[in-house]
A protein has these predicted regions:
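Aromatic- and glycine-enriched pocket-lining scaffold segments that form the walls
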Residues: 142, 146-185
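A contiguous strand-loop segment
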Residues: 24-123, 156
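Positively charged n-region of N-terminal signal peptides that target proteins for export
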Residues: 1-6
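Bacterial N-terminal signal peptides
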Residues: 7-17
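C-terminus-biased signal that marks the final domain/tail of proteins
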Residues: 23-38, 46, 52, 157-159, ...
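Short helix/loop capping segments that flank catalytic or ligand/cofactor-binding pockets
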Residues: 48-49, 112-114, 181-184, 191-195, ...
């Protein structure tokens, strides 16, 4: 188990036969002055996710089916959960539980390597697709997760709904007070790192954190004019303090950009302000359809921002918007019965009334 110090933010090889193009996701933690913590996350992918929001009460009986078709670990959920699924399978791409624990599953291509089932106890073994729900349904704190994971064997499984690949993923876990960890399975085994509040994709988390050292000069204050040989040079316009911030959609660039925005932005007083700031930060990493491509073929499109979520961990509210409907919508977890035997609810994230509100009638005559 490894720990990385929180610094300036106070300031797998996967066993598949095909190469994995990088998929883009970005996550940022925002703390309001009143202590409220929100987690904002964008979800970029090329294949339509067709995600649903799922609300599932406590008492759900689960079993992880292993690659050989036999049963692995079994559990009954201790906590009600709210999450977004994907690809028509019951997998938690992102979500939180009624204790306010947040989990994010982000793509980790070329670096994720899961554990070997050989010699492992089946009763303590699960496929990686089930790990996010297992965490959300069983734990309330980061310490509980850190204690439980070394006792599990997590193996890969081919996913027919996603071109039969083994999904390469790494995970973030946050408590309502903002304490967070990053979980990665690599060739070195299980790695658990303290989170600096930002997450994207490959390479491994320590690389991204070290890379922030290259950008300690980023500043919200404009550069002062200088005089060289009697000639004065001054920055043109606003923003010269951020000169050099990477602007491309690659994972390293998005990590630095989100980190700088989260650290330098004006502090927000409460949950509403934190939610608003998280959305603005995610705007800076948004990927329009067609701007990122895996291949030159004009019919081939790469990643685009299919949806974003912002989770208010204190108030148990999930905000979301989609590529086709940029209006922000919300689901309040507190309004659902989470007792065992209560109903399970689902709703597609796509669709809705649309992002445009006609306010023509609001205009009044004036002198």
């Amino acid at each position: 188990m490894r720990t990385i110090s929180l610094f300036i933010l106070a300031l797998s090889v996967v066993f598949t036969t095909l190469p994995q193009p990088s998929r883009a996701c970005t996550e940022a933690r925002i703390k309001a002055e009143d202590g409220t913590v929100v987690i904002g996350r964008s979800m970029e992918f090329a294949q339509p996710l067709d995600s649903n929001i799922v609300v599932q009460p406590r008492g759900q009986v689960n079993v992880s089916t292993l690659p050989d078709g036999r049963d692995g670990i079994k559990w009954t959920s201790k906590y009600g959960v709210m999450y977004l699924d994907g690809f028509g399978i019951d997998v938690a791409v992102d979500g939180m539980n009624e204790a306010g624990l947040s989990l994010g599953s982000l793509f980790f291509p070329g670096a994720a390597q899961y554990q070997d089932m050989k010699g492992a106890k089946r009763s303590r073994t699960m496929v990686v697709n089930d790990l996010p729900l297992y965490i959300l349904q069983n734990f309330a704190t980061v310490d509980e997760v850190k204690e439980a994971l070394p006792k599990l064997t997590v193996v890969g499984i081919h996913t027919p709904a996603l071109q039969n690949i083994v999904i390469p993923a790494h995970f973030s876990v946050y408590e309502p007070d903002g304490t967070g960890i990053i979980v990665e399975y690599t060739k070195d085994g299980l790695n658990i790192y303290d989170s600096v509040g930002i997450m994207t994709n490959s390479p491994a988390y320590p690389w991204h954190v070290t890379n922030l050292n290259n950008y300690v000069g980023l500043n919200s204050v404009n550069a002062e004019p200088i005089v060289v040989d009697g000639v004065s040079f001054a920055a043109t316009g606003q923003g010269s303090g951020l000169n050099g911030i990477p602007g491309d959609p690659s994972p390293p660039a998005r990590f630095v950009r989100a980190a700088a925005m989260a650290y330098l932005a004006a502090k927000t007083p409460n949950a509403d302000g934190a939610m608003n700031l998280a959305v603005h930060i995610l705007n800076t990493v948004d990927i329009p359809l067609g701007t990122v491509r895996d291949f030159a073929d004009k019919e081939s499109f790469g990643d685009y921002t299919q949806w974003i979520v912002v989770k208010d961990l204190a108030n148990r509210v999930l905000y979301f918007r989609t590529y086709g409907n940029t209006a922000l919508r919300s689901v309040d977890m507190k309004k659902f019965d989470m007792s065992p035997g209560a109903k399970r609810f689902t709703m597609p994230v796509d669709g809705g009334a649309g992002a445009v509100t006609d306010v023509t009638a609001g205009l009044k005559p004036s002198s």
